[in-house]
């Protein structure tokens, strides 16, 4: 597992560095100045590695910050017919359900996965577990935690519920991923979250309507109910970890 982790992250970083160098060569003004063998220039590789590292850190937090400040907290302050803490948790709950099946982190085909599992013949199970574990721990739990606490407390949400949020997001994603794997074993139909079916889009529309439409008329889930659902989501994630 450790060897798979080292190779997979090295491969991902190499792919990202090469993508950065390729992008530099597509800039008209730089294209003529940069050497043809750009990928072999040590200095440019160091620079690209630094940029890749900075981008990895930013990707952990920047997207979450924008998510909370716009789609959850930013929109939430527009509603005046319900308590702000209830509105915050209500919107977050339904958006998390949408994200659980639209962005599982496990059924998203990417080029680095193709290189690793198809071209390099790496163990698909180990490779997937390494990257999925990284996504759950860092991109969700660590990435969500500071903003869940900050924006939640601004909306007067109790701290203990704020602390549940990242684990609820992670747990629900794990539960949906486990169900999708079970469904694949039963029906043999592989899921590609980049190509969702009509039913998935209809359900997404209904959930968005529930997230943003209901608070407009003063209808939101009470905080206790939302907190209970958060706990159920966490327990579902723990149970699905066996999958």
Predicted segments with their positions:
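Hydrophobic alpha-helical transmembrane segments of membrane proteins
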Residues: 1-114, 124-243
